[in-house]
């Protein structure tokens, strides 16, 4: 009996895709710290993280409901709860909707209405626009659909300030440009899975050379965008962004050259290291804010 209950609980947890949520929440804290230069109340941070977790869990759960048919086809996703019938589809839908409503009400109560509305917008965009419209129709699915994954920085900033500014927009764009290289590198490895499921990911419909060229272009856009925040951040962020950006661009160029040269291609290496890149850059931003270091802009003025 206990084993069955535990299995059911784990199935519902798996619906939320916790590993995906982890990285998204990593971006929320630095955005909040930057918004008030490290003076944010810890209770507000924890409340925003909890509300953001519920919102992301809602979006991921509803995504699993819509994608249950293709999850059964793809080897990478065949063990997801709905793909193996561990959770009834109707229960998963109610679970996802309940989390979504709870996240809105929680953030409205603990932060402000703007933060709550941004979470609702994120859930709606991810499920209705990305999952139901873009994902199975165009190779640009992850380009525009990835905007949902950029929203935690907007939620975090608005939870502190009750408004939006250019800084969270820059952070939004960093994640926006980061998403295609991150996702396409994974899709290169699981190309046959996506092809079998009828999902037109770029690696499915284009040559590896074209894919790696696009990865390279988006990587450059990501690094250049990250540098535009340097005047509003401190020297730690500036140094970390320069080093991490150069390192990531080197890996992207290596992947492109290996494809052009006919060498063994290892896209998963770029996929895994892209997680490290994003984490390092945002941690650098958080350290700057917590230490209360002078911004680069003030040092140069």
Curated annotation (Swiss-Prot):
The chain crosses the membrane at residues 9-29, 42-62, 89-109, 113-133, 142-162, 168-188, 211-231, 232-252, 280-300. It is found in: Cell membrane. The keyword Mitochondrion does not apply. It is a multi-pass membrane protein. Pathway: Porphyrin-containing compound metabolism; heme O biosynthesis; heme O from protoheme: step 1/1. Keywords: Cell membrane, Heme biosynthesis, Membrane, Transferase, Transmembrane, Transmembrane helix. It comes from the Bacteria. Coiled coil: none annotated. Its main location: membrane. Its EC number is 2.5.1.141. GO terms for molecular function: protoheme IX farnesyltransferase activity. Gene3D superfamilies: UbiA prenyltransferase. One of its GO terms (biological process) is heme O biosynthetic process. It catalyses: heme b + (2E,6E)-farnesyl diphosphate + H2O = Fe(II)-heme o + diphosphate. GO terms for cellular component: plasma membrane. Belongs to the UbiA prenyltransferase family. Protoheme IX farnesyltransferase subfamily. Carbon 2 of the heme B porphyrin ring is defined according to the Fischer nomenclature. Converts heme B (protoheme IX) to heme O by substitution of the vinyl group on carbon 2 of heme B porphyrin ring with a hydroxyethyl farnesyl side group. This is Protoheme IX farnesyltransferase. It comes from Rhodococcus jostii (strain RHA1).
């Amino acid at each position: 009996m206990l084993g069955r209950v535990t299995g059911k609980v784990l199935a519902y947890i798996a619906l939320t895709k916790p590993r995906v949520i982890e990285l998204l929440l990593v971006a929320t804290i630095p955005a909040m710290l930057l918004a008030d230069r490290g003076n944010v109340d810890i209770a507000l941070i924890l409340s925003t993280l909890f509300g953001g977790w519920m919102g992301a869990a809602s979006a991921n759960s509803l995504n699993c409901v819509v994608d249950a048919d293709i999850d059964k086809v793809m080897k990478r996703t065949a063990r997801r709860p709905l793909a193996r019938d561990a959770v009834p589809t109707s229960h998963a839908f109610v679970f996802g909707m309940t989390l979504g409503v709870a996240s809105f009400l929680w953030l409205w109560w603990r932060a402000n209405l703007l933060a709550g509305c941004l979470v609702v917008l994120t859930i709606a965009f991810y499920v209705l626009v990305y999952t139901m419209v873009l994902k199975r129709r165009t190779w640009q699915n992850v380009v525009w659909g990835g905007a949902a994954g950029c929203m935690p920085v907007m939620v975090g900033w608005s939870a502190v300030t009750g408004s939006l500014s250019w800084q969270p927009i820059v952070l939004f764009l960093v994640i926006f440009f980061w998403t295609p290289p991150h996702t396409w590198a994974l899709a290169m490895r699981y190309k046959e899975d996506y092809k079998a499921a009828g999902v037109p990911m770029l690696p499915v419909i284009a040559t590896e050379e074209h894919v790696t060229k696009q990865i390279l272009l988006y990587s450059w856009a990501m690094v250049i965008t990250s540098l535009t925040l340097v005047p509003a951040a401190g020297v730690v962020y500036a140094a970390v962004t320069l080093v991490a950006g150069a390192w990531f661009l080197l890996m992207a160029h290596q992947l492109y050259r290996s494809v052009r040269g006919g060498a063994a291609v290892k896209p998963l290496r770029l996929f895994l290291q892209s997680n490290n890149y994003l984490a390092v850059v945002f941690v650098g931003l958080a350290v700057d804010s917590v230490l209360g270091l002078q911004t680069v802009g003030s040092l140069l003025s």
